[in-house]
Amino acid sequence: MVVSEVDIAKADPAAASHPLLLNGDATVAQKNPGSVAENNLCSQYEEKVRPCIDLIDSLRALGVEQDLALPAIAVIGDQSSGKSSVLEALSGVALPRGSGIVTRCPLVLKLKKLVNEDKWRGKVSYQDYEIEISDASEVEKEINKAQNAIAGEGMGISHELITLEISSRDVPDLTLIDLPGITRVAVGNQPADIGYKIKTLIKKYIQRQETISLVVVPSNVDIATTEALSMAQEVDPEGDRTIGILTKPDLVDKGTEDKVVDVVRNLVFHLKKGYMIVKCRGQQEIQDQLSLSEALQREKIFFENHPYFRDLLEEGKATVPCLAEKLTSELITHICKSLPLLENQIKETHQRITEELQKYGVDIPEDENEKMFFLIDKVNAFNQDITALMQGEETVGEEDIRLFTRLRHEFHKWSTIIENNFQEGHKILSRKIQKFENQYRGRELPGFVNYRTFETIVKQQIKALEEPAVDMLHTVTDMVRLAFTDVSIKNFEEFFNLHRTAKSKIEDIRAEQEREGEKLIRLHFQMEQIVYCQDQVYRGALQKVREKELEEEKKKKSWDFGAFQSSSATDSSMEEIFQHLMAYHQEASKRISSHIPLIIQFFMLQTYGQQLQKAMLQLLQDKDTYSWLLKERSDTSDKRKFLKERLARLTQARRRLAQFPG
């Protein structure tokens, strides 16, 4: 269940219009009428707000953001826009300051409001390092140390996160991501491409639909010229997820105050989430060591007494406490909207990573006996896939075709070749029969069939099929070889020595079986030079041919033997030979069209597959080669480890989402 926006609105103490309640001033609550009701509101607020933020923070701590975008507020601004001052005012601690690039790594600022404690606690964590801080004055030093460790001690930047957690009664419940200030040109010892690098880092965050961009802009500049707002508009042209923060209102030129008011009231550059205006410590106040709490008091007095800006204070659009309330409310609403989609994304990604991890198998055992069993499993899986190919039962994708189906297609083409061969022969019989009759006729009287003429024609037509049969053998062999190689890739791809060994055996056995298959095919065609058919079979075929011709004669669609019409005796002899040829062709084509595919299947699928399976099993005989055969590609174990880490993160994320009390 996800916390609804209505629930958040009901529980939001901002509705009570007591900014100090956010900062934990219990005495003010006691003095105000209706303080009990307000305290109840605070309690409800804590029950709903903190779990939402903690959930997202815990997912970010797990590293889920490496896999999916999480709801966040990213703070961006040009250099010297007052971005650091705003974050200091919200967090109550001093952050790194100075000239040039101060924020050199994304800083995740986790603020946690303590209700019944006065003790301040802090923690800085990055990479595998973590340090607890008990004094707020130590924060700046630790952040600088973290940035130097990650990005070096120069002026470079890094995409690696630093996390600063602050728990205090004086901070709001809020998590922000502070990004480096935008710079246009490199100065001093900054890298020449520093501006491009910073913009790339910022875009990485703000282009995500899950990110609210908090754009910090000085009040004394033309808002349309600021790089930060321009970048936000580029990725969020409708301004749906952008909040504008105006700073330095005390530096606004006289006579331009009304323009600033128009900006804050969303009349100049429209943003759906609107604008806020704040006054933080100036440089002189920092040098004078003005405390942050005192700065908040001065800010309130400034807006209360300002002739133009006091209305903005009354409208809840001014001061840091109002900003804190707005940001917390926006973040919680944003999280609530994002949670259902986030849960689905985590589920889908978890499933995809699980499937991908299965392709990489399990880690290779260290123990020699375990290696043997591991290799046995691998070889057995390979052999089972080969058996499935041999039996035409392999699993294929929606767009793929089984090997046996493709072989059937080749065998069907072979039948067509045979049919076309005989049909083409029938077309030219009228010329050849007369030639053979004149060449081979012996003592027989006209009208008698010359057997040698018949035999010679049969032999020539069948002999013409020998090379197409051998061509089909080579075609099928390549198809089977590729299919077997694909099985090797599927099972052994990550083990390059095992895959290479399997490929070598696939090739060696292919060559041997192809030679044997071709030898038997050519032997078959040698046997086909013996003109033979069982008597009863041949008589039946001849009878059918004659019956068909009689039927065609009745329909006056008899064959045209134009060249032989001058002699009725010759016509009779030629018709007789033609009938015998037709009868023999029918029976021979049945024999050849089935027998040649049988030979090919036997040698190039069944025996080929069986010999390959035996050869792979023989690998198990030499224990000394186990380690060599199971040597993985250099990136395989790294990829498996990476996927396991992702899967572990996503598994924990799913568990935490399932346990979320909302």
Swiss-Prot record:
Its main location: cytoplasm. It is found in: Cytoplasm; Endoplasmic reticulum membrane; Cytoplasm, Perinuclear region. ISGylated. Residues 178-181 are annotated as: G3 motif. Residues 367-632 are annotated as: Stalk. Belongs to the TRAFAC class dynamin-like GTPase superfamily. Dynamin/Fzo/YdjA family. Homotetramer. Oligomerizes into multimeric filamentous or ring-like structures by virtue of its stalk domain. Oligomerization is critical for GTPase activity, protein stability, and recognition of viral target structures. Interacts with TRPC1, TRPC3, TRPC4, TRPC5, TRPC6 and TRPC7. Interacts with HSPA5. Interacts with DDX39A and DDX39B. Interacts with TUBB/TUBB5. The GTP-bound form interacts (via C-terminus) with THOV P5 protein. The GTP-bound form interacts with LACV protein N. Interacts with CCHFV protein N. This is Interferon-induced GTP-binding protein Mx1. It comes from Homo sapiens.
